[in-house]
């Protein structure tokens, strides 16, 4: 079996029929060639030397890889496979806080990679074009470029506000049953769905204590980024239908044009101008760019909170979900974007790295150079 051809078939089937539900996925991911490729990718990653709770690292697994893959295959097909809890570690963030990571056992990472290889082609056609996080051939730079393009058509006199979306502890608050419901829209294989349920319910070990997973997907899991995108795709599609689709834009143009021309219905019913909205998301970070009044922007922020908290059971941090004007600048994905007047008198959008982030980078670079000076070699990892 040629894996890339099978992935292309999955992508084609999904793109051709948006309502298609794929069957027999478990049989696919347990093919020896499929598991072998998943193992190759897993063991070639930088994190392969880091063991999970079972203490098995890359060297130990490679010594008996063929046997271990056969055991995995038998367990998956028989339904006896049970993932181990992830090993919880904490890494420092730039603001001084700690970010929790869950490190699965290597054998579980292989299974998650096999699942990802099958699921990713199916969902790529479903995901919104303005979603950039954890997707093939997309990056932070693509997202920043998109936002800059969305801002370049604005003149100095046009209102342009930005909603800086901030989800509270997103990866830790994903609702399991809502996630499974979203996955079932594309997968009808009951055995595969059982495997996915076991994976998100595996829990983690923190300071020697087991903690069950009632909600959330672990940061550090191979399949977690895809699952997070599947969940937030519901939000993307809501915004698309409400503000971003061709129909929504056409309706807005007709509405505003009626007001401008003073048509009787618009005058009689005292219609208000509808705001224009642009959108970009990278994982759990998103921005909405609104051409309208401050009151309209605040109403849209409240609408977003209603969708996220009501339909998806996620929490929008209202204290951090700010509404700055583009002339005052805003932060997105570690970049500060601001609209300025150039020396030629034109308004343009400039992106810079905030001073605090630049200082942190300079400090880490200085520490790295000091290590080189002391040891004579760059210490990786």
Curated annotation (Swiss-Prot):
Looking at the record, the residues that make up the Reverse transcriptase domain are 72-337
CDD domains documented for this protein:
RT_G2_intron
Superkingdom of this protein's organism: Bacteria
Binding positions (Mg(2+)): 166, 284-285
Known Pfam families for this protein? RVT_1
Give the matching InterPro entries: DNA/RNA_pol_sf, GrpII_Intron_Splice-Mob/Def, RT_dom
The secretion signal range is none
Alphabetical keyword list: Magnesium, Metal-binding
Q: Report the GO molecular function annotations.
A: metal ion binding
Family per UniProt? Belongs to the bacterial reverse transcriptase family.
- Other facts noted in the record for this chain: Encoded by the CP4-6 prophage. A short reverse transcriptase-like protein missing about 140 C-terminal residues compared to orthologs.
The record's annotation in PANTHER family points to: NUCLEAR INTRON MATURASE 1, MITOCHONDRIAL-RELATED, PROTEIN YKFC
Entry protein name: Protein YkfC
Q: Which organism is it from?
A: Escherichia coli (strain K12)
């Amino acid at each position: 079996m040629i894996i890339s051809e099978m992935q292309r078939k999955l992508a084609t089937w999904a793109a051709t029929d948006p309502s298609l539900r794929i069957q027999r996925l478990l049989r696919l991911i347990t093919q020896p060639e499929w598991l072998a490729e998943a193992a190759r990718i897993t063991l070639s990653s930088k994190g392969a030397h880091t063991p999970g709770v079972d203490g098995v690292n890359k060297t130990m697994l490679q010594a008996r890889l063929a046997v271990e893959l056969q055991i995995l295959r038998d367990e998956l097909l028989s339904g006896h496979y049970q993932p181990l809890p992830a090993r919880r570690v904490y890494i420092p963030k730039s603001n001084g806080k700690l970010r929790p990571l869950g490190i699965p056992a290597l054998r579980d990472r292989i299974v998650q990679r096999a699942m990802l290889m099958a699921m990713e082609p199916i969902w790529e056609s479903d995901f919104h074009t303005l979603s950039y996080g954890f997707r093939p051939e997309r990056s932070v730079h693509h997202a920043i470029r998109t936002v800059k393009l969305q801002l370049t058509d604005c003149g100095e006199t046009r209102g342009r506000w930005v909603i800086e979306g901030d989800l509270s502890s997103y990866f830790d608050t994903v609702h399991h049953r809502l996630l499974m419901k979203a996955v079932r829209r594309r997968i009808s294989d009951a055995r595969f769905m059982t495997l996915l349920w076991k994976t998100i319910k595996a829990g983690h070990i923190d300071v020697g204590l087991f903690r069950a997973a009632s909600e959330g997907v672990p940061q550090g899991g191979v399949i977690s980024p895809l699952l997070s995108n599947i969940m937030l795709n519901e939000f993307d599609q809501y915004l698309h239908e409400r503000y971003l689709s061709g129909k929504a834009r056409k309706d807005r143009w007709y509405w505003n044009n009626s007001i401008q021309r003073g048509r009787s219905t618009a005058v009689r019913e005292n219609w208000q101008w509808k705001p224009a909205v642009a959108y970009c998301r990278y994982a759990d970070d998103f921005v909405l760019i609104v051409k309208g009044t401050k009151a309209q922007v605040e109403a849209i922020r409240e609408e977003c909170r209603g969708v996220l908290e009501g339909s998806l059971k996620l929490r929008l941090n209202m204290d951090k979900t700010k509404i700055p004007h583009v002339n005052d600048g805003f932060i997105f994905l570690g970049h500060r974007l601001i609209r300025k007047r150039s020396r030629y008198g034109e308004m343009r959008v400039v992106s810079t790295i905030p001073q605090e982030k630049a200082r942190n980078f300079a400090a880490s670079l200085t520490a790295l150079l000091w290590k080189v000076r002391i040891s004579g070699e760059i210490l990786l990892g």
